[in-house]
């Protein structure tokens, strides 16, 4: 509170869900900078409209927390990569992307689930190569499929940077099993490994396609040459 007892909020939060598309966006950033307070957009930013001017404005601001964008569909990957090259040239701060998945899954559509998981990992692969974090956002439809728990396991790995940056998805799954064996008397297969094995059995004919993505590691995938000139 100030000297008159009035509540003074330490941060400014903004709820506009598409503020980047506003023509006077850089003016808004300048006004926020002028307040002297850290600020944060509470919705994911739309990187598709990012340009040099917007990237510079955001990178010089007192932003609170991680910058968060959205990478919802694989078909956007060329555009997202072009914008990432701009963004990474100007911003050194941690950058995270929401990764939407699981939409319109039904209980018997195995092909759709495989393609959805495969292209989810292709998006993660791009983010890793640019030194960015992913955050898996599951639509409730993922629960319709008998293999829906694979999304839960992916989210448990991807949404926690200490795992995402240090181990592959496959290593994370195996670590769950070893942790259970080390800390309990149970001899059962843990839920994570059981889900992984069921996924592999179901898609054995496609396993060679997705296995390298499950074994992909952040530290071996990040490539500064993608954005450094």
How should each PLM-predicted stretch be described?
Residues 1-83, 93-101, 133-137:
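Core AdoMet radical
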Residues 33, 88, 125-129:
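Anion (oxyanion) recognition and catalysis
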Residues 89-90, 115:
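Extended, compositionally biased non-globular segments
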Residues 103-229:
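Auxiliary Fe-S-binding modules of radical SAM enzymes
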């Amino acid at each position: 509170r100030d000297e008159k007892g009035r509540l003074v909020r330490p941060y400014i939060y903004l709820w506009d869900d598409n503020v980047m598309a506003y023509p006077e966006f850089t003016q808004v950033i300048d006004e926020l900078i002028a307040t002297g307070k850290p600020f944060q957009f509470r919705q994911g930013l739309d990187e598709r409209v990012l340009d040099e001017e917007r990237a510079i404005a955001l990178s010089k601001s007192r932003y609170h927390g991680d910058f968060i964008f959205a990478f919802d569909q694989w078909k956007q990957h060329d555009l997202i990569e072009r914008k990432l090259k701009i963004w990474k040239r100007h911003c050194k701060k941690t950058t995270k992307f929401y990764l939407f998945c699981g939409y319109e899954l039904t209980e018997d559509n195995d092909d759709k689930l495989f393609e959805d998981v495969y292209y989810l990992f292709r998006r993660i692969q791009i983010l890793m190569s640019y030194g960015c974090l992913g955050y898996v956002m599951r639509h409730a439809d993922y629960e319709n499929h008998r293999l829906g728990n694979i999304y839960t396991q992916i989210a448990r790995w991807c949404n926690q940077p200490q795992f995402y940056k240090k181990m592959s998805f496959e290593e994370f799954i195996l670590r769950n099993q070893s942790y259970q064996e080390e800390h309990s008397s149970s001899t059962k297969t843990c839920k994570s490994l059981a889900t992984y094995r069921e996924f592999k059995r179901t898609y054995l004919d496609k396993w060679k396609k997705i296995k390298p993505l499950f074994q992909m590691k952040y530290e071996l995938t990040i490539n500064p040459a993608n954005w450094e000139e």
